[in-house]
């Protein structure tokens, strides 16, 4: 009985990881393309968010030639001393913490304009890349093997083999997802390549500490490693746009939507006629040459 009580207590603790603020009253309104949800004292932020979202809608959707089938939900929260945004692209929902972000590793940008555009690009680009639509996030092929039956009254023998092969519904690596979300669209000015970002990339370049192509395809790093995935992805997306045209970013996403395409390396090759690893080598060589010239001026 004691173990049952302990189990129930632990279940309650881990089942309530976030306080849901039951004291708040929530409100909603709709615009042409969005459903906006906000709570007490956040109406001004919600109204501004709606204006921003409608302003950037055509730019983002035309860049990727894709529109959501339904209105996108935007939830505005201002309950914590915290700033962030999240895109739930299978749910067609964006959550925004309204407080402006003061992030030392990036320059100063207008918060709501920046974060709403960033997250909406996630919604559009990742939905564009889906192989099976928003209703099927993935699938598994499984095979189970069994020992030979030893008794006539037993239908199956003891299971001795399990083969499971996951089939993801999206296969966009972090560097590309975050890189194009920071790039946003042609002529976008809410987020820019600022001196803070350049400092991080320059330091890694001149100290031969750039992340590898495989490393920028995952998160889970220490220190500024995760930020460097954002940073390098943004720089690489800008490089692709400059060298091959911004349409290449959309075409890579389209290629990754192919049900049989699960390699960004091959997707890049099919679009740019150069595989991802060689593209990244060219990108690194360009960075080294550029920063060598710049640092020679101050030596």
Give the role of each language-model region.
Residues 4, 16, 24, 219-220:
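Alpha-helical interaction segments
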Residues 3-12:
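Sec-dependent N-terminal signal peptides
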Residues 21-22, 91-93, 111-115, 123, ...:
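Acidic/His/Gly-enriched intrinsically disordered linker/tail segments
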Residues 16-166:
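Juxtacatalytic substrate-recognition/specificity segment
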């Amino acid at each position: 009985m004691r173990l049952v009580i302990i189990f129930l207590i632990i279940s309650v603790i881990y089942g309530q990881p976030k306080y849901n603020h039951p004291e708040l009253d929530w409100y909603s309104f709709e615009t042409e393309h969005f459903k906006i949800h906000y709570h007490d004292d956040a109406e001004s932020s919600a109204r501004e968010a709606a204006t921003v979202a409608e302003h950037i809608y055509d730019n983002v959707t035309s860049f990727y030639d894709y529109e959501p089938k339904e209105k996108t939900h935007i939830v505005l929260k201002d309950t914590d001393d915290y700033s962030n945004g999240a895109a739930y692209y299978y749910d067609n929902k964006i959550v925004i913490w309204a407080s402006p972000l003061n992030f030392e590793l990036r320059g100063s940008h207008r918060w709501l304009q920046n974060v709403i555009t960033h997250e909406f690009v996630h919604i559009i680009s990742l939905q564009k890349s889906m192989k099976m639509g928003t209703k099927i996030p993935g699938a598994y092929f499984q095979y189970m093997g069994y020992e030979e039956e030893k008794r006539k009254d037993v239908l199956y023998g003891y299971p001795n083999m399990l083969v499971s092969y996951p089939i993801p519904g999206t296969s966009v690596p972090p560097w590309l997802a975050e890189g194009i979300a920071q790039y946003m669209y042609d002529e976008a000015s809410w987020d820019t390549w600022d001196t803070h970002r350049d400092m991080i990339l320059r330091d890694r370049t001149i100290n031969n500490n750039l992340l590898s192509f495989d490393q920028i395809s995952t998160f889970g790093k220490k220190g500024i490693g995760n930020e460097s995935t954002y940073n390098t992805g943004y720089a690489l997306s800008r490089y692709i746009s400059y060298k091959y045209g911004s349409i290449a970013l959309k075409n890579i996403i389209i290629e990754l939507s192919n049900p049989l395409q699960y390699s960004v390396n091959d997707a890049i090759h099919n679009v740019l006629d150069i595989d991802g690893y060689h593209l990244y080598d060219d990108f690194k060589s360009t960075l080294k040459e550029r920063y060598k010239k710049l640092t020679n001026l101050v030596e």
